[in-house]
């Protein structure tokens, strides 16, 4: 008994240590996202009520990756209406649920989010991740006239955040009440199209706001439509709906499909009625994994001719073994390649744009959809490449600082390392070759004669750096903006 107690204590200590390490990684500042966003329409910006340093790794990514008007216009072939709104309250922003809700409501009002065409209440995964493909597809299709609001409840992967779902549901329910209360005070014609989004654990923590209730309750909360990707098997609302869809959704507005092709094949009347989409791949283990498969054969391992597509007919259920193997599948299902969209396992990127258009009633032309799909892939690949390059540069800088310390260089080492590293990188891969191309002017005849006769021609060369000086002074202009949160902030547009 003593040995078991010691073993149990050791395992618990190891788990807690692992949790702390993962949380530290979730709060870490990535080199690619060290600087706060400059758009006043996103959290963490100089005009935001939310400090950038409290957003966590996923929050900093989410706010920094918002599209600009120019990016939207270039893809859609028509001028963007406005800059998109992205609001994120981190787990470290404030410790109390009530304070987080108040803070994000203040941000919604500050940015005039309730005046946008579409307002999205999104529930993140355990780590705080909001699907970038979803967010960008929405911003393209609305021409920027949209807002996405979300609150973090954990910095751990979804598999390690299962004990925090109660907090997440409570937090989401509190924000839902706050948003619907605000919408209730608006005239019907002035309200935005209020929609929901959740992926993986985010789908569970959003749907279970209405646990033991019905789709009609969602309608009473002004919810226009929703998209849920890879809904976990433990989701109470989804389980109740699957068992008795006629009671939970008498109007048939909720559908569960594997891919968008199944939506296209629907009866026209059924497709027209659909507003709430549960997208669950047949080979995604997230909607299948649960303690219920430990001792009981799951429905998806029934007779071979009744199994969903892509579930091997040769696979048999074994007590305990099936549970372990399905758990292993959880890891493999989330293995994705940036820029290469798939439609397998827990990767839903392939169909997201079309589901956004269909569920949220945001029609686009076939040409625009093609351009959106291409842009989504290109952007995801670019962001991934930028992160890799930034991390490599950061590691090189750290190595250089250590070497300089060994040389006895301590004062101003950081600045020296930055300068030296920039010089080395500039020689290897000049980012701005324009000044180098102008160098041949020195070899022109103007160099030989006028250089000696008239010093006036050398003076422009001395003044040339002055053209770059505003760029160096630019941060000084931004400094006052960071001091604004000390007092009441005006609404954007006032």
Please name every model-derived segment:
Residues 133, 197, 464-465:
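Hydrophobic alpha-helical segments that drive targeting, anchoring, or assembly
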Residues 197-203:
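Gly/Ala-rich beta-loop-alpha elbow adjacent to hydrolase catalytic centers
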Residues 434-481, 485:
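Low-complexity, polybasic segments enriched for Lys interleaved with small residues
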């Amino acid at each position: 008994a003593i040995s078991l107690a010691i073993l149990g204590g050791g395992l618990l200590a190891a788990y807690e240590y692992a949790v702390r390490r993962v949380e530290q990684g979730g709060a870490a500042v990535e080199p690619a996202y060290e600087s706060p966003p400059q758009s006043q329409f996103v959290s963490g910006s100089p005009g935001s009520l939310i400090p950038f340093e409290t957003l966590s790794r996923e929050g900093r990514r989410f706010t920094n990756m918002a599209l600009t008007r120019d990016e939207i216009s270039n893809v859609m072939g028509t001028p963007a209406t406005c800059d998109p709104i992205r609001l994120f309250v981190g787990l470290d922003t404030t410790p109390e649920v009530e304070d987080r809700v108040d803070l994000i409501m203040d941000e919604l009002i500050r940015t005039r989010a309730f005046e946008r065409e579409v307002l999205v209440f999104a529930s993140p995964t355990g780590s705080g991740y909001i699907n970038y493909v979803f967010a960008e597809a929405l911003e393209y299709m609305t021409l920027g006239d949209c807002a996405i609001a979300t609150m973090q409840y954990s910095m751990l992967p979804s598999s390690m955040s299962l004990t925090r779902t109660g907090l997440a549901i409570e937090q989401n329910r509190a924000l839902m009440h706050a948003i619907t209360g605000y919408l209730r005070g608006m005239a019907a014609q002035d309200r935005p199209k209020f929609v929901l989004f959740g992926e993986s654990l985010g789908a569970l923590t959003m749907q279970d706001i209405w646990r033991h209730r019905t789709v009609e309750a969602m309608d009473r909360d002004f919810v226009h439509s929703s998209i849920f990707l890879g809904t976990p098997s433990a989701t109470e609302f989804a389980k109740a709906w699957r068992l008795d869809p006629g009671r939970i959704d008498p109007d048939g507005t909720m559908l569960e499909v594997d891919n968008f092709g199944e939506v296209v094949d629907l009866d026209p009347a059924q497709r027209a009625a659909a507003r709430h989409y549960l997208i669950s791949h047949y080979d995604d283990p997230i909607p299948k994994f649960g303690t219920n498969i430990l001792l009981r054969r799951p429905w998806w391992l029934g007779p071979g001719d009744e199994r969903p597509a892509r579930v091997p007919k040769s696979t048999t259920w074994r007590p305990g073994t099936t549970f372990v193997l399905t758990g292993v599948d959880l890891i493999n299902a989330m293995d994705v390649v940036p820029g290469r969209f798939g439609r397998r396992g827990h990767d839903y990127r392939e169909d997201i744009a079309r589901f956004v258009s269909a569920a949220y009633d945001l029609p686009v032309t076939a040409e625009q959809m093609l351009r959106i799909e291409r842009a989504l892939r290109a952007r995801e690949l670019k962001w991934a490449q930028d992160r890799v390059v930034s991390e490599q540069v950061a590691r090189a800088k750290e190595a250089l600082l250590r070497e300089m310390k060994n040389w006895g260089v301590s004062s101003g080492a950081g600045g020296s390392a930055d300068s030296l590293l920039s010089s080395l990188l500039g020689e290897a891969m000049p980012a701005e070759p324009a000044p180098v191309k102008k160098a041949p002017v020195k070899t022109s005849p103007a160099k030989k004669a006028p250089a000696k006769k008239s010093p006036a021609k050398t003076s422009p060369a001395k003044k040339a750096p002055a053209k770059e000086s505003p760029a160096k002074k630019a941060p000084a202009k931004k400094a006052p903006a960071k001091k604004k949160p000390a007092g009441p902030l005006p609404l954007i547009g006032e």
